[in-house]
Amino acid sequence: MSKEISLVYMVAGMSSRFGWKIKQFSKVWPDNTTLIEYSLKQALPAGFSKIIFIVGKMTELPFKEMFWNDYKWIPVEYALQKFDETRRDRPRWTVDALCSAKNNIDWSFVVCNGDDIYGSESFKILYNHLEKSEYSATLWYILGNVIPDEWSTNRGIFKVDLDNNVTDIKEIIWIEKNKLTEIWLKTEDLCSMNIFWLSKSALEWLYTILNTFKTNNMWDRRIECYLPVEISNLIKEEWLKMKLYPTPDTRFWVTNPEDEEIVKKQIEEYENNKL
């Protein structure tokens, strides 16, 4: 009997690089399928029981208008990520986003970015992991393959033991493809793309961490609470064990408006190669 697992998408943010439009609504397929619909097309065959969108005040209504209360007969729920604009310039990033959905998450879940295409096998790997292990799990990507050519980006860099258990995830910011060696990175390093299988108890621990973070940084308008960093802290404190898996899938992403056509061509080629 399959276990209940939720699929949680972080879709609260809007990017200045993308002209303050919703990246997840980029048309990436000839029939006008959006990026988020294509991601769901890949994910749902794995067997997820519920879809949860973590939205912001600018994305809440558009997502509700697109998906309503169900998608492909799977229940859809929404969690609103809020922040105090008198104290903050923006939300506290991904731990804050995930904890916004605390009351929507009833069981184990996979959480991921809403503007990335991870591939159908990636979701199957994480979903199937639950059938054989109670550990948390995540996927690795080759760093050199997931850095934009012209823009800096952030990535969580993995360290693992001989049994492919994650021992550390170090969040590196402002990574530039042509300057890796300057910050002691290599193109072949294994990195995170913010897709994790986690338990309900892990979410409770992250919620406690977030509350402490908020108290300790009450007046800092920009400091952020990164999901890979706090997962790493739970691992180091032995509250969490996490398996790391390779994925055969190619990951696609949209950063700038011109990426929409690029990704559309990449996905078309990807689909044709599957035939």
Regions found by a protein language model. Give the residues of each.
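Active-site metal-binding loops of divalent metal-dependent hydrolases
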Residues: 14, 115-116, 143
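Conserved alpha/beta core of the MobA/IspD/sugar-nucleotide pyrophosphorylase nucleotidyltransferase superfamily
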Residues: 169-172, 177-275
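Conserved core of the sugar-phosphate nucleotidyltransferase
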Residues: 119-204
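N-terminal glycine-rich phosphate-binding loop and ensuing alpha1 helix
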Residues: 2-66, 85-86
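Hydrophobic packing residues within well-ordered alpha-helices of enzyme cores
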Residues: 62-67, 126, 206, 263
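Short phosphate-binding loop-to-helix
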Residues: 71-108
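Short beta-strand-to-loop acidic/aromatic patch adjacent to the donor-nucleotide binding site
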Residues: 107-117
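Residues at the starts of beta-strands that form the adenosine-phosphate
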Residues: 49-51, 75, 108, 135-137, ...
